[in-house]
Regions:
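Disordered, acidic Ser/Thr/Pro-rich linker "stalks" and the adjacent N-terminal cap
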Residues: 1, 12-17, 38-103, 150
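A short beta-strand element within beta-rich, extracytoplasmic domains
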Residues: 3-41, 105-115, 126
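Surface-exposed beta-strand edges and their flanking turn/coil or helix-capping segments
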Residues: 10-11, 22-24, 63-70, 122-124, ...
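A short, structural micro-pattern
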Residues: 30-35, 75, 87-89, 118-120
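Substrate/cofactor-recognition hotspot
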Residues: 15-16, 28-29, 46-57, 98-100, ...
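Residue-level detector of functional hotspots within protein domains
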Residues: 25, 63, 67, 79-81, ...
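Generic, low-specificity signal for short hydrophobic/alpha-helical stretches with a mild N-terminal bias
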Residues: 21, 77, 108, 159, ...
Length: 185
Protein backbone atom coordinates (compact mmCIF):
# COMPACT_ATOMS: atom_id res chain seq x y z
CA UNK A 1 0.00 0.00 0.00
CA UNK A 2 0.97 3.64 -0.45
CA UNK A 3 0.74 6.78 1.67
CA UNK A 4 -2.61 8.61 1.61
CA UNK A 5 -2.41 12.12 0.16
CA UNK A 6 -6.11 13.08 0.02
CA UNK A 7 -9.61 11.93 0.90
CA UNK A 8 -12.83 12.30 -1.04
CA UNK A 9 -16.23 12.49 0.64
CA UNK A 10 -19.04 11.65 -1.76
CA UNK A 11 -22.58 12.55 -0.71
CA UNK A 12 -24.92 10.14 -2.47
CA UNK A 13 -28.62 10.04 -3.30
CA UNK A 14 -30.78 7.22 -1.98
CA UNK A 15 -34.47 6.55 -2.57
CA UNK A 16 -34.94 5.77 1.14
CA UNK A 17 -33.96 9.31 2.20
CA UNK A 18 -36.18 12.41 2.28
CA UNK A 19 -36.24 13.86 -1.27
CA UNK A 20 -33.65 11.14 -2.16
CA UNK A 21 -31.04 12.81 0.09
CA UNK A 22 -28.14 12.90 0.36
CA UNK A 23 -29.02 14.40 3.75
CA UNK A 24 -31.40 13.15 6.41
CA UNK A 25 -33.13 16.46 7.15
CA UNK A 26 -36.87 15.79 7.28
CA UNK A 27 -38.71 18.07 9.70
CA UNK A 28 -37.03 21.47 9.69
CA UNK A 29 -35.10 23.05 6.87
CA UNK A 30 -35.14 21.61 3.37
CA UNK A 31 -35.96 17.91 3.20
CA UNK A 32 -33.01 15.80 2.12
CA UNK A 33 -30.50 18.52 3.05
CA UNK A 34 -27.36 18.21 5.20
CA UNK A 35 -24.88 20.65 6.72
CA UNK A 36 -21.30 19.48 7.31
CA UNK A 37 -19.61 21.91 9.72
CA UNK A 38 -16.22 20.28 10.20
CA UNK A 39 -14.23 17.39 8.74
CA UNK A 40 -11.08 16.12 10.44
CA UNK A 41 -8.65 13.23 10.06
CA UNK A 42 -6.67 11.82 12.99
CA UNK A 43 -4.51 8.85 13.87
CA UNK A 44 -3.54 7.59 17.31
CA UNK A 45 -0.80 10.15 17.80
CA UNK A 46 -1.77 13.16 15.66
CA UNK A 47 -4.29 15.17 13.70
CA UNK A 48 -3.65 15.40 9.93
CA UNK A 49 -3.98 18.89 8.45
CA UNK A 50 -6.23 19.34 5.41
CA UNK A 51 -5.27 22.04 2.90
CA UNK A 52 -7.13 23.62 -0.02
CA UNK A 53 -10.28 21.47 -0.05
CA UNK A 54 -12.55 21.74 -3.11
CA UNK A 55 -16.11 20.65 -3.91
CA UNK A 56 -18.15 19.81 -6.98
CA UNK A 57 -21.03 22.04 -5.81
CA UNK A 58 -21.88 24.03 -2.71
CA UNK A 59 -24.85 26.05 -1.49
CA UNK A 60 -26.34 26.72 1.93
CA UNK A 61 -30.12 26.97 2.32
CA UNK A 62 -30.40 28.33 5.88
CA UNK A 63 -28.46 31.29 7.25
CA UNK A 64 -25.88 33.50 5.65
CA UNK A 65 -22.47 32.83 4.23
CA UNK A 66 -21.22 30.67 1.44
CA UNK A 67 -20.73 26.94 1.18
CA UNK A 68 -17.01 27.03 0.47
CA UNK A 69 -15.17 23.74 0.81
CA UNK A 70 -12.70 25.43 3.17
CA UNK A 71 -15.53 25.98 5.68
CA UNK A 72 -15.18 22.36 6.85
CA UNK A 73 -11.66 23.01 8.18
CA UNK A 74 -12.07 26.52 9.63
CA UNK A 75 -12.94 25.46 13.20
CA UNK A 76 -16.23 27.40 13.07
CA UNK A 77 -19.27 25.20 13.65
CA UNK A 78 -21.62 27.80 12.19
CA UNK A 79 -19.98 27.63 8.76
CA UNK A 80 -19.91 24.53 6.60
CA UNK A 81 -20.66 22.77 3.34
CA UNK A 82 -24.02 21.75 1.92
CA UNK A 83 -25.50 21.01 -1.48
CA UNK A 84 -28.83 22.75 -1.02
CA UNK A 85 -31.00 22.83 -4.11
CA UNK A 86 -29.42 19.62 -5.42
CA UNK A 87 -31.35 16.98 -3.46
CA UNK A 88 -31.27 13.57 -5.06
CA UNK A 89 -27.92 14.28 -6.71
CA UNK A 90 -24.39 13.13 -5.90
CA UNK A 91 -21.65 15.64 -5.10
CA UNK A 92 -18.25 15.41 -3.50
CA UNK A 93 -15.68 17.17 -1.39
CA UNK A 94 -11.95 16.57 -2.00
CA UNK A 95 -9.69 17.03 1.03
CA UNK A 96 -5.93 17.07 0.27
CA UNK A 97 -3.63 16.48 3.23
CA UNK A 98 -0.74 18.80 4.06
CA UNK A 99 1.42 15.72 4.73
CA UNK A 100 0.63 12.17 3.57
CA UNK A 101 -0.57 9.60 6.06
CA UNK A 102 2.07 6.84 5.97
CA UNK A 103 1.08 3.51 4.46
CA UNK A 104 -0.59 1.08 6.87
CA UNK A 105 -1.37 3.81 9.41
CA UNK A 106 -4.76 3.44 11.04
CA UNK A 107 -6.72 6.68 11.04
CA UNK A 108 -10.19 7.93 11.76
CA UNK A 109 -12.42 10.54 10.19
CA UNK A 110 -14.68 12.80 12.22
CA UNK A 111 -17.55 14.72 10.67
CA UNK A 112 -19.39 17.35 12.71
CA UNK A 113 -22.93 18.32 11.68
CA UNK A 114 -23.65 21.39 13.78
CA UNK A 115 -26.94 23.16 13.13
CA UNK A 116 -29.98 23.87 15.30
CA UNK A 117 -31.78 20.93 13.66
CA UNK A 118 -30.75 17.47 12.44
CA UNK A 119 -28.81 17.81 9.17
CA UNK A 120 -26.55 14.76 8.97
CA UNK A 121 -25.72 12.74 5.88
CA UNK A 122 -27.90 9.79 5.03
CA UNK A 123 -25.65 8.12 2.48
CA UNK A 124 -22.01 8.82 1.76
CA UNK A 125 -18.77 7.18 0.71
CA UNK A 126 -15.19 8.05 1.66
CA UNK A 127 -12.30 7.13 -0.61
CA UNK A 128 -8.59 7.90 -0.54
CA UNK A 129 -5.79 8.46 -3.03
CA UNK A 130 -2.02 8.30 -3.01
CA UNK A 131 -1.73 10.62 -6.03
CA UNK A 132 1.10 13.11 -5.49
CA UNK A 133 -0.63 15.79 -7.56
CA UNK A 134 -2.99 17.86 -5.47
CA UNK A 135 -6.42 16.52 -6.45
CA UNK A 136 -9.41 18.81 -6.93
CA UNK A 137 -13.12 18.11 -7.08
CA UNK A 138 -14.60 17.68 -10.52
CA UNK A 139 -18.20 18.10 -11.60
CA UNK A 140 -18.58 14.37 -12.21
CA UNK A 141 -18.33 11.67 -9.54
CA UNK A 142 -16.23 8.60 -8.89
CA UNK A 143 -18.30 6.28 -11.09
CA UNK A 144 -17.86 8.55 -14.12
CA UNK A 145 -14.13 8.88 -13.40
CA UNK A 146 -13.77 5.10 -13.22
CA UNK A 147 -15.36 4.64 -16.65
CA UNK A 148 -13.43 7.52 -18.21
CA UNK A 149 -10.13 6.12 -16.92
CA UNK A 150 -10.40 3.19 -19.36
CA UNK A 151 -9.98 3.16 -23.11
CA UNK A 152 -13.31 3.75 -24.90
CA UNK A 153 -12.89 0.47 -26.78
CA UNK A 154 -12.77 -1.47 -23.50
CA UNK A 155 -15.93 0.12 -22.02
CA UNK A 156 -18.94 -2.16 -21.78
CA UNK A 157 -22.33 -1.32 -23.23
CA UNK A 158 -23.60 -0.65 -19.68
CA UNK A 159 -20.71 1.74 -18.99
CA UNK A 160 -21.33 3.65 -22.22
CA UNK A 161 -25.05 3.90 -21.40
CA UNK A 162 -24.11 5.17 -17.94
CA UNK A 163 -21.91 7.88 -19.50
CA UNK A 164 -24.66 8.88 -21.93
CA UNK A 165 -27.19 9.15 -19.11
CA UNK A 166 -24.75 11.18 -17.01
CA UNK A 167 -24.14 13.54 -19.91
CA UNK A 168 -27.85 14.05 -20.58
CA UNK A 169 -28.54 14.62 -16.87
CA UNK A 170 -25.75 17.14 -16.41
CA UNK A 171 -25.34 19.06 -19.67
CA UNK A 172 -27.11 22.45 -19.29
CA UNK A 173 -28.25 22.37 -22.93
CA UNK A 174 -30.65 19.53 -22.04
CA UNK A 175 -32.10 21.24 -18.94
CA UNK A 176 -35.45 22.11 -20.54
CA UNK A 177 -35.95 18.56 -21.80
CA UNK A 178 -35.01 17.12 -18.38
CA UNK A 179 -37.40 19.25 -16.31
CA UNK A 180 -40.50 17.00 -16.66
CA UNK A 181 -38.42 13.94 -15.75
CA UNK A 182 -36.69 15.70 -12.84
CA UNK A 183 -40.10 16.77 -11.49
CA UNK A 184 -41.10 13.09 -11.20
CA UNK A 185 -38.13 12.21 -8.98
Amino acid sequence: TAPITALRLEVLPDDRLPERGPGRCYYEGRKGDFFLSEFSVASKDRKWAIVNPTHSYGKISVGGGGANASNVIDGDGSSGWSTSGQTGKAHHLVLPLKEPIPANTKFSVQMLFERHFVVSLGRFRISVTSDLKSPVAKKHGAEVEAVLAHKPSSASKEQMNFLRRHYLESDPRWKKQRQPIDALR
